[in-house]
């Protein structure tokens, strides 16, 4: 296939979503450059792969490139995008570049408010177990390969579809997975109906020979079904699901469940990932594998050897009888799900949480939901809001959130104005046998790492 080797520049190349696409393009032989405000493990990796990395955003960084790729976090007034437009260089969203990559192969896109990253990683492992060697682009680092992207030699590509700004509608996947729909990204969507409409458009973009894979246990996903006029399959715990998990049990960090397809028993899975949410993620992956003719024995083997995803209920270490975990969860639903999984895994231990709210807009739109999301934590330390490029909103801060948490009945809430003060509070609060988990999409994981280092 003819493919001109364009020069492609990424603004914010160190982001987890941008870097995966950049890595794939480098491996395909394209000339890739990018800028970010700080150096990181990600930018260092891309530089070693041959990328040209600039620290800071400057107009001259885009000189000579053919296209500029931006994420939704990049502001309109960014000097690089402004310079590109002045020069007539196309400026496109990340999702459009990903959609172009997906056009080259048989594509599987995983969308949903929660569980996208883990489900994408499991689908990739399932297809690999079937000998399909897929290309993978994911919003988190796969522990098995140490990266968020992999160039496969097979005819399939598996990618995470980000609904946050509606740009996932640029994709036209052959298989579209919807894990769930929730009230999220309200800075972009005006209400829940608009969110559901976006997902309805997403599943409608599959070709006539394609397939939608839908979680029947998510009520907003159920609302899509009457409007779908192409082939679809459902999964869940309910008996109405085409692919059903039954007899679910948990023991420590392990889950077990029986898989039935159209009422026929396929087998029992032992999953080395905790939580009911990972049972759902696995069901979606099984559905994709079966559609692509991966034998169930291969699917089972893949699921039972999963190594997980960085920052998804990841055990960071143990010290002095204390287990330290980390999770990316930053939405009330994710927080409740994660804490349920931790309590199921460690039913006789105290659970302590260090939470860093992510974005002022999210904290504002889901404020009361956040205030009622931590009942399964024995104690809670709340850090200042991680802005993620947003400007502060008056009255929206972690002090107000702590007051609301206490007002809703949480007995042990501590406000920590810095990571250093959070560590000081933990020294006074944590005791042997506790499970300590850092929660949030920012850099809260550093508190857990510092805690482990201070006690080693």
Swiss-Prot record:
It comes from the Bacteria. The keyword Ligase applies. Keywords: ATP-binding, Cell cycle, Cell division, Cell shape, Cell wall biogenesis/degradation, Cytoplasm, Ligase, Nucleotide-binding, Peptidoglycan synthesis. ATP binds at residues 112-118. It catalyses: UDP-N-acetyl-alpha-D-muramate + L-alanine + ATP = UDP-N-acetyl-alpha-D-muramoyl-L-alanine + ADP + phosphate + H(+). One of its GO terms (biological process) is cell wall organization. Pathway: Cell wall biogenesis; peptidoglycan biosynthesis. One of its GO terms (molecular function) is ATP binding. Its EC number is 6.3.2.8. GO terms for cellular component: cytoplasm. It is found in: Cytoplasm. HAMAP family: MurC. Belongs to the MurCDEF family. Cell wall formation. This is UDP-N-acetylmuramate--L-alanine ligase. It comes from Desulfatibacillum aliphaticivorans. The lineage of its organism: Bacteria, Pseudomonadati, Thermodesulfobacteriota, Desulfobacteria, Desulfobacterales. The gene is murC.
